[in-house]
Amino acid sequence: MENNKQDDHQEEFIFRSKLPDIYIPNHLPLHSYCFENISQFKDRPCLINGATGEIITYADVDLTSRKVAAGLDKLGIKQGDVIMLLLQNSPEFVYAFLAASYIGAIITTANPFYTPAEVAKQAAASKTKLVITLAGYIDKVKEFTGGESGVKVMCVDAPPPESECLHFSELTQADETEIPAVKIHPDDVVALPYSSGTTGLPKGVMLTHKGLVTSVAQQVDGDNPNLYFHQNDVILCVLPLFHIYSLNSILLCGLRVGAAILIMQKFEISKLLELIEKFKVTIAPFVPPIVLSVAKCPDLHRYDLSSIRTVMSGGAPMGKELEDAVKEKLPHAKLGQGYGMTEAGPVLSMCLAFAKEPFPIKSGACGTVVRNAEMKIVDPDTGASLPRNQSGEICIRGKQIMKGYINDAEATKGTIDEGGWLHTGDIGFIDNDDELFIVDRLKELIKYKGFQVAPAELESMLISHPNITDAAVVPMKDEAAGEVPVAFVVRSNGSKITEEDIKQYISKQVVFYKRINKAFFIEEIPKNPSGKILRKILRAKLVTEQAI
């Protein structure tokens, strides 16, 4: 729906969901909201531990989370304190996150594969008081924990001998009746993820109780939820919970509706397919690299995947060719995309094929703006809002967006304008059916003699080639053109595809300025946990290639 209004003599084009706004109880603390209806499903499975097969009920997850909350208080963690989770997916991750919400503490999540320097930087910036991790990662935190630092470390597995490391059982054995009485304000921060930093240094994103409650409700609440999850669903959680997409759209949305959440520690294709078959997974949230692995898996036919009713993809755009490949392999499943950004809380748009009463959708679209929010497309140069079918920067406004970047008023001001609009840095357009199409990142566009070349477009073509497993396209400096597109390509097993083959394959499909200038073959495309290509690394590789 589009509202036109006059503002300083400039027409505003504002887009809303096709679904009506709903009542959202965003006065509730996050844990109270997630477990608001727990009496209806307290004896049902809440978490399934993929590594052990253990099934934990909603009643037990809530009880353990409250014990952990009391234990954290006993340990000296108070309202407003920050706890870092340096963990892979595990039940303990869930208990710690919910426990922090109970006592008004804040969780900052860190990638266990970070270097010690990256972990230390995040711990210092967030003023972390406690790190919960695995014994194998203790070396990453020893520089800034223990002794005079006052920062405690806790392991969820057996701590290394002779270390000061506490054990998670100290929390789970606490008395849940001793949770302190805290008054949680809806604007209090509950999660502090660090945005990927692909466009600068990582910054702490302040997500509040109100913001996350709003975001979850926008997805799964209402008579016709945009994302229809229910108590009988088994939701696959293979995407890392330290990333907001998984934390919000899988864990929190799953808890809210009483679904079972199947936790996998890490992605491994045969184990993933085995668990889908064993536990009859119904909802499969993926990122494009996993979608690609499933679509190209030669053993797919050996597994019964007929239980899957929904395949969600987010984190990075998924091309039409990849969509078609998945539809062919999983014809019974609904496939669609959502679009998110950590700072936006994170979901901006969601595929309406996922609704309880679904709408028709177009291939390549990444959904319609979520309900109870507004979206506009603005000209990156003038800031003017644009009508349908015109590409510009995507902006969103609503109670789900971040409070701001922690201790960085300037960066906050550069992202959220005075009107409350969050500027994403992504380029896209909204079509006549209210569907959003992402064209590319503002900063990733390749400029060939002034022509814009979108890497995502070329990447989807490359990936559709049977002899290519994965690909990324970045700009290379060129005296005549300014920039030309070059490809980094991962060959399929045993493939002998050449640079010349690739150039010809693309040149047949695109206008002259989009042709691939060079192709480099590599083992793996570097990506962040959400599946976004780390173009900085590839551009750095290019510089060394050109210097040779």
Curated annotation (Swiss-Prot):
Gene Ontology cellular-component terms listed = cytoplasm; cytosol
Question: Per the record, what are the reactions this protein catalyses?
Answer: (E)-4-coumarate + ATP + CoA = (E)-4-coumaroyl-CoA + AMP + diphosphate
Top enzyme class, one word, equals ligase
State the residue spans of region: SBD1: 268-337
Indicate which residues the UniProt annotation says bind ATP.
Answer: 195-203, 337-342, 426, 438-441, 532
Supply the alphabetized keyword list.
ATP-binding, Cytoplasm, Ligase, Nucleotide-binding
- Note the PROSITE patterns from the entry: AMP_BINDING (PS00455)
Q: In which tissues is it expressed?
A: Mostly expressed in glandular trichomes (lupulin glands) after flowering, and, to a lower extent, in stems, leaves, cones and flowers.
Q: Which residues form the signal peptide?
A: none
Q: What is its main location?
A: cytoplasm
Q: GO molecular function of the protein, one example?
A: 4-coumarate-CoA ligase activity
> What pathway is this protein said to act in by its record?
Secondary metabolite biosynthesis
* Region described as SBD2: 338-405
**EC number(s)?**
6.2.1.12
Where does it reside?
Answer: Cytoplasm
Question: Which family does the record assign?
Answer: Belongs to the ATP-dependent AMP-binding enzyme family.
Free-text domain note: Both substrate-binding domains (SBD1 and SBD2) are involved in the substrate recognition, and are sufficient to confer the substrate specificity.
Known role: Involved in the biosynthesis of prenylated phenolics natural products which contribute to the bitter taste of beer and display broad biological activities. Catalyzes the ligation of CoA on (E)-4-coumarate to produce (E)-4-coumaroyl-CoA.
Q: What is this protein called?
A: 4-coumarate--CoA ligase CCL1
What is the species listed in this Swiss-Prot or TrEMBL entry? Humulus lupulus (European hop)
Query: Gene encoding this chain?
Result: CCL1
